[in-house]
């Protein structure tokens, strides 16, 4: 009987590990077993660990899925990362894992992703919680700012990816000041 339990446990563990072995552009840490799911999406360059305190409070009542996006905090980078791909892949994750109407909680860039997912896939999402998401910082300081949705950000991406770790940290500190 003990051997059967051990085999069943190993099979379930293996299956649960395969669930998150998909080709998503983010890592997922699952905790809690509540009926309602919450998906936590961190901000730019942040680890999902920024949600640790919140998850510690909610995991007794909710099933928590904490994402860390590709290229941040030890998650392998993508060759061509994009907001659009991340949005579509998070929606795919919700569908494939059969997560019913999760609460999406996003900070900064994660807030933008949360809004985009809820707008495009309202049938997939329950409630949304947005923490400090600013859609366009330039619009705050330039009164006649006009949106240009087809901006080519290649130069900016090249400059950021060419930075060493210290330069990147310094840039983050300057933007937070």
Question: What are the residue ranges of the model-derived segments?
Answer:
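Short glycine-enriched nucleophile-adjacent loop
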Residues: 111-122, 128
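Conserved HGGG/HGGXW glycine-rich cap/lid loop of the alpha/beta-hydrolase fold
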Residues: 30-76
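Alpha-helical elements of Rossmann-like donor-binding domains used by nucleotide-donor carbohydrate transfer enzymes
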Residues: 27, 50-53, 57, 85-93, ...
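Alpha/beta-hydrolase fold catalytic core
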Residues: 2-39, 59-62, 96, 100, ...
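Active-site micro-motifs of SAM-dependent methyltransferase domains
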Residues: 46, 71, 111, 135-136
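Active-site loop/oxyanion-hole signature of alpha/beta-hydrolase fold enzymes
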Residues: 65-105, 109, 120
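Flexible "cap/lid" loop of the alpha/beta hydrolase fold
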Residues: 119, 127-165
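Alpha/beta-hydrolase
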Residues: 166-177
């Amino acid at each position: 009987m003990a051997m059967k339990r051990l085999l069943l446990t190993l099979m379930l563990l293996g299956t649960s590990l395969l669930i998150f072995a998909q080709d998503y552009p983010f890592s997922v840490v699952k905790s809690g077993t509540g009926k309602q799911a919450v998906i936590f999406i961190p901000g730019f360059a942040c680890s999902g660990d920024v949600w640790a305190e919140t998850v510690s409070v909610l995991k007794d009542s909710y099933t928590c899925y904490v994402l860390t996006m590709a290229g941040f905090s030890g998650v392998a980078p993508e060759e061509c990362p994009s907001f659009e791909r991340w949005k579509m892949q998070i929606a795919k994750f919700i569908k494939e894992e059969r997560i019913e109407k999760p609460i999406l909680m996003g900070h900064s860039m994660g807030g933008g992703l949360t809004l985009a997912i809820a707008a495009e896939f309202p049938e997939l999402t329950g409630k949304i919680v947005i923490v400090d998401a600013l859609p366009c910082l330039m619009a705050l300081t330039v009164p006649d700012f006009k949106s240009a949705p087809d901006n080519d950000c290649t130069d900016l991406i090249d400059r950021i990816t060419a930075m060493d770790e210290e330069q990147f940290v310094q840039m983050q500190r300057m933007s937070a000041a």
